[in-house]
Amino acid sequence: MTQLVSVITPVHAPSVEYLAGAYDSLVKQDMPDGWDWQWLVQEDGQTGTLAQVLPDDPRISIGGGRPGGPGVARTLALSRVTGDLVKVLDADDQLTAGALARDIVAFDAHPEIGWTTSRVLDLMPDGSTVGWDKDPADGTIGRGAVLAFWQANGYRAQVHPATLCIRRDLLLALGGWMALPASEDTGLLLAASAVSEGYFTREYGLLYRKWPGQVTSQAAHREPVEYEGRMKIIEARAQALATMLPNGLSLTPAA
């Protein structure tokens, strides 16, 4: 029986034009024997646009719902997940060659981990790429390490939430993505790290597109009152999980 990685992509109108690139990066993934992917593309709205722009591929599942932001869209897509592993892929980003296979290998080699992340290259408007100099070493990341780094470095984690691959059972136990207008992916990463070990792959796993229309480039994303509120609730949730579950969560390894 084929095992699946369920790739979830939330879509808002300005990012539709980049879906072809995201799909192309999925098609080019060289999967391990016995594995395939499904792509759950979730519109943050109900315009029906996705059916007009996505190819006819049985691995694609299209959904929509009332507008609620990326966290709501991601969590609604979770209802259609059939894989034991859930991978994040934003509509304007692209996976690098072998990214999914490396996630799978990490889970197989380390059944104790609940999630994986990888290195990121920022994809600039002119086509150039820019890396980051604070990537951790290749290997496992202890419970709580992401939160500690995030707190000590101005609310910036040492691993990128846009590269997250997480066990479905753990994702469900944490309630999916946080009900926030933004930073919901960071909230999930810190919550997962609070209750389980993770793994970091130093090979580049994602091209993270920088462009004027992306949500994180908007002025509202850094509006002080909302920003501080988001950071406080993300921090409080992770700390509460760590306190209430000092031994972490018992994980169900992917079959």
Where are these regions (language model features)?
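Conserved donor NDP-sugar-binding/catalytic core segment of glycosyltransferases
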Residues: 100-132
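Acidic donor-binding loop at a coil-to-helix junction in glycosyltransferase catalytic cores
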Residues: 181-188
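A recurrent flexible, glycine/aromatic-enriched loop bordering the glycosyltransferase active site
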Residues: 144-165
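Glycine-rich, basic loop-to-helix element that forms the pyrophosphate-binding segment
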Residues: 64-81
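Catalytic core of nucleotide-sugar-dependent glycosyltransferases
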Residues: 143-146, 204, 208-211, 217-248
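Short aromatic/hydrophobic "clamp" motif used to bind/position activated sugar donors
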Residues: 86
